[in-house]
Amino acid sequence: MLRVRCVRGGSRGAEAVHYIGSMLRKGFVGWVQRSFQSTQAAAVSEKPCAADEKVSDTAVQECPVCSYNEWDPLEEVIVGRPENANVPPFSVEVKANTYEKYWPFYQKHGGQSFPVEHVKKATEEIEEMCNVLRHEGVVVQRPEVIDWSVKYKTPDFESTGMYAAMPRDILLVVGNEIIEAPMAWRARFFEYRAYRPLIKDYFRRGAKWTTAPKPTMADELYDQDYPIRTVEDRHKLAAMGKFVTTEFEPCFDAADFMRAGRDIFAQRSQVTNYLGIEWMRRHLAPDYKVHIISFKDPNPMHIDATFNIIGPGLVLSNPDRPCHQIELFKKAGWTVVTPPIPLIPDNHPLWMSSKWLSMNVLMLDEKRVMVDANETSIQKMFEKLGISTIKVNIRHANSLGGGFHCWTCDIRRRGTLQSYFS
């Protein structure tokens, strides 16, 4: 059973780990006792930041990579690129993650560029976002520009690419380790290539680098007969625990994991299966504990527009997708904040996301948040919480599927690992 000892930030919310560790474990025990087969490719630097498991906080802080949560002071970040963004082919896994009104768009433009003028405006917005981050004292890194329209073929499928816009989807930083997620969309199979120059540099400078087992993405990974004719069908299926991805092999996107020190919260989604969560659980054990949480509407592609932990014991919980375990957080003393209804216009294209990108914010520290300049309601909410808002307009960038949290991957945050284990 978990016992709490907070190293920093007080004890607010820390007890939630005890509750979730004891309550959620009950529903997952049967699953984790099965014998899963997984592989991993982990690299160890010639001069690693951590020579053993008992490395000091000082040693870890000297690494180019160090981040334990979503709110410690941000020092370095990767920001994605919209350049050459390509519409993914309209395959079954894409259909399961997009809204019905956009299906004709994918059927018509799959394998082609997203609207050029829209991407141009998104590029300008993200450049401004980078400038603002630099002004706030954050080091900004960018992935490579790649031609995503090139068709590729594996023994199991063929596809074109998509983009390198959302580093949060593919990279998860846990302490001094960068984990490359395997992904679940065929159009994103080679997305890691855009980030390899950066990752290799971090590795040479001492960071740990792990690549999760790459799925074949064979037909068996997907329910080819997933019965979705409308969004309502999809919501009902997901609520029953039926997703387009099967348990044929591990798959997950990094954006389905939310970090809070030694405890990491994950959801089973259309792109993250239980095998993928189990791989992560085994890989991070015993130093970190992965907890599965679930929601009334489990269909959204990633967790960070549903459940966003923005401080120690402080969480944004989407009112349209309430967390089934939210009372456990409340009983533990967490402050649960319900964000206001988003203000994004109905006629603004959101090809692979919902309006709730308004809560997909990036914390620069516990008292500063990067938020969309158009979302005045949520700005007021943050101000009432005593959090200063840094306003940037990324409406066109939203159309490509992400808010500030999605468009970034924090590489370094100045802080220490909180201990939650006995």
UniProtKB/Swiss-Prot annotation:
Transmembrane segments: none annotated. Coiled coil: none annotated. Its EC number is 2.1.4.1. The active site is at D253, H302, C406 (amidino-cysteine intermediate). Its main location: mitochondrion. It comes from the Eukaryota. It is an enzyme of class 2 (transferase). Residues 1-37 form a transit peptide. One of its GO terms (molecular function) is glycine amidinotransferase activity. It is found in: Mitochondrion inner membrane. It catalyses: L-arginine + glycine = guanidinoacetate + L-ornithine. The keyword Metal-binding does not apply. Pathway: Amine and polyamine biosynthesis; creatine biosynthesis; creatine from L-arginine and glycine: step 1/2. Keywords: Membrane, Mitochondrion, Mitochondrion inner membrane, Transferase, Transit peptide. GO terms for cellular component: mitochondrial inner membrane. One of its GO terms (biological process) is creatine biosynthetic process. The keyword Transferase applies. Belongs to the amidinotransferase family. Catalyzes the biosynthesis of guanidinoacetate, the immediate precursor of creatine. Creatine plays a vital role in energy metabolism in muscle tissues. May play a role in embryonic and central nervous system development. This is Glycine amidinotransferase, mitochondrial. It comes from Xenopus tropicalis. The gene is gatm.
